[in-house]
UniProtKB/Swiss-Prot annotation:
Encoding gene, per UniProt annotation: rplQ
Similarity comment: Belongs to the bacterial ribosomal protein bL17 family.
Pfam families attached to this UniProt entry: Ribosomal_L17
Superkingdom of the organism of origin: Bacteria
Alphabetic keyword roster: Ribonucleoprotein, Ribosomal protein
Keyword hit for Magnesium: no
InterPro entries found in the cross-reference section: Ribosomal_bL17, Ribosomal_bL17_CS, Ribosomal_bL17_sf
Organism from which the protein derives: Moorella thermoacetica (strain ATCC 39073 / JCM 9320)
BP GO annotations: translation
GO terms for MF: structural constituent of ribosome
Protein name: Large ribosomal subunit protein bL17
GO CC entries: cytosolic large ribosomal subunit
Subunit: Part of the 50S ribosomal subunit. Contacts protein L32.
Length: 112
């Protein structure tokens, strides 16, 4: 499976992505770099698909990946049912410009 390394070791990269997915589902939108957002998009869509399924096994898979139990509850009670009739495309990436310090391309990723 292809993925982006994001300039980090495997454990650091996985934990960073878990943190970002948890934040996105908690707040509905976040601003991050373009490469992180592209990697985040597929993970967030997988989590929302688990929320749509709504069974016990899906809930346990989400609990194993997400870092906050309140976010898992929100995923299964609010976010999953909101996208019950939609097949994919739950997130949107909007370019917002470049970061002041290093010129990295920044984007806003949000739930549609």
């Amino acid at each position: 499976m292809a993925y982006r390394k994001l300039g980090r070791l495997a454990g650091h990269r996985k934990m960073m992505l878990r943190n970002i997915v948890t934040s996105l589902l908690k707040h509905g939108k976040i601003e991050t770099t373009e490469l992180r957002a592209k990697e985040l998009k597929s993970l967030a869509e997988k989590m929302i698909t688990l929320g749509k399924r709504g069974d016990l096994h899906s809930r346990r898979q989400a609990l194993a990946y997400l870092l906050d139990e309140d976010v898992v509850t929100k995923l299964f009670k609010e976010i999953g049912p909101r996208y019950a009739d939609k097949n994919g495309g739950y997130t949107r990436i909007v370019k917002t410009g470049f970061r002041q310090g290093d010129g990295a391309p920044m984007v806003l990723i949000e739930l549609v």
